[in-house]
Amino acid sequence: YYIAQLTELLTGYGEIFSVWLDGACGEGPNGKKQVYDWERYYACVRKYQPDACICVCGPDIRWCGNEAGDVRKSEWSVVPARTALAESVQERSQQSDDEEFRQRKITSDMEDLGSRIALEGEHDLIWYPAEVNTSIRPGWFYHPEEDDRVKTVDELTDLYYRSVGHNATLLLNFPVDRDGLIHPTDSANAVNFHQNVQKQLAHNLLAGLSPKASDERGRTFSAKAVTDGDY
């Protein structure tokens, strides 16, 4: 059933750029354990949408570890391959509709994933960049009583610098109301947030500067390579 539904989604709606396999527990109160055939799901996505990124419980984009929009100070993109195990993502994911979980922050004792110290002794590394998922409201769905709890322009701007600014992509949820519309407050705050970030980043502070380093490892790794545009 799941493969049939996934196939329908992947073949009937044009180009899909992202498939989000949530790690949140889908088991009910009957005590039965749900077993997921992850490799089969991945193969289905690759077959019908080969350019789509498979996120969270997938091999392409990793979850940052919380739903509060909080990331590690250094959110590395090259990490040990073991971090992509879908089962371990499930264990850390939300098990019920819990606002306390949604507000959980990154703590100092959470695993350092990609520093040189963390990678020492690791033999299997992968490119596995992080994605930050959070909502413009307290939760994922629309509730009229939360119309005055929408993230402000300043809060959204801070969220941007704490996610994108820390080397992660930002997935911002907009709960639609019962008419299928985004609330005017949510929309206005998002537009003003975008304009605020564009204004703050309009001037490239590095333009025209000549990078220097206290030490260099040969000409190939000279400081000027930072701005030479050769990737």
Which residue stretches match the model-derived regions?
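Mature catalytic domains of secreted/periplasmic carbohydrate-active enzymes
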Residues: 1-230
